[in-house]
C-alpha cells in the first residue's frame, strides 16, 4: 500500500504532520506538498516556469508550486509506482459548499482523482487547530476502510471534521455540498508605504445549510463526507439553453 499525501497549507503545516503520523504503519507514506502556503490556489497548474522538487529534513518532499502541481508531479514524474490512495490535508479551516471551488486542499485530491487514483480531501472546520488528532484519526479510519474494502472505481471524497475531541464526535454522515452567501467585500487598507492595498474578504456565511448538507452535519458535531464529481455541466439547463440559441 502506497499512500501519497499533500496539502495546500505547505509542507511545514502541523495538519500535514499529524496526518502523516496517523497514517504511518498503514503502508509506505510519501509526502509531496507546496513549499509555501497555497491556500485558495484551486486547481491551478504552474506553466510559466519549471518546478523544483526538494526534500526537507523531515523526509517530506516540497515543490515550489501549487497543490495540483505537487500531486501531478508526484504521480506522473516522481514515483516509480503509483499510489493506491491520495489524502490531502489536514486543512486548517473548513472546505464546505462553495469552498470546494477555491480550495487547494480539495484541488490536490481532485488531481489524484483525475489521474485515476482514489483521493480524499480532509479539513478541520475551524482556524484554531486545537484537535488535529481528531481529524487525523478520522483520516486513518477512512484509509483503513479503503484497505479492507477497496472501492472499484476512483472516488473523490471531501471530508470535514469538527474541531472537537474525537470522543465528542457524533459519528459520520454522507452529505451533499451546501451553499454559502456571496463572499464579504474586499478589505481596503493603507500599506506602510502609503499604498492602497486590498485583502480578499471572508467567505460568506452558510446560505443552504439544511438537512443533508455538509454545513448541517458539522454544526451537529458529525464528520461530513461528500462524494464529489468533476462534471460541471448544468444538465437541467441543457434544453433551455438549446431553445434560447434557436
Swiss-Prot record:
UniProt keyword list: Cytoplasm, Hydrolase, Metal-binding, Nucleotide-binding
Cofactors demanded by this protein: a divalent metal cation
Superkingdom of origin: Bacteria
CC cofactor note: Binds 1 divalent metal cation per subunit.
List of residues binding a divalent metal cation: 8-9, 39, 91
Pfam name, any one: SurE
PANTHER family: 5'-NUCLEOTIDASE SURE, 5'_3'-NUCLEOTIDASE SURE
Family stated for the protein in its record: Belongs to the SurE nucleotidase family.
Protein name: 5'-nucleotidase SurE
Organism: Dechloromonas aromatica (strain RCB)
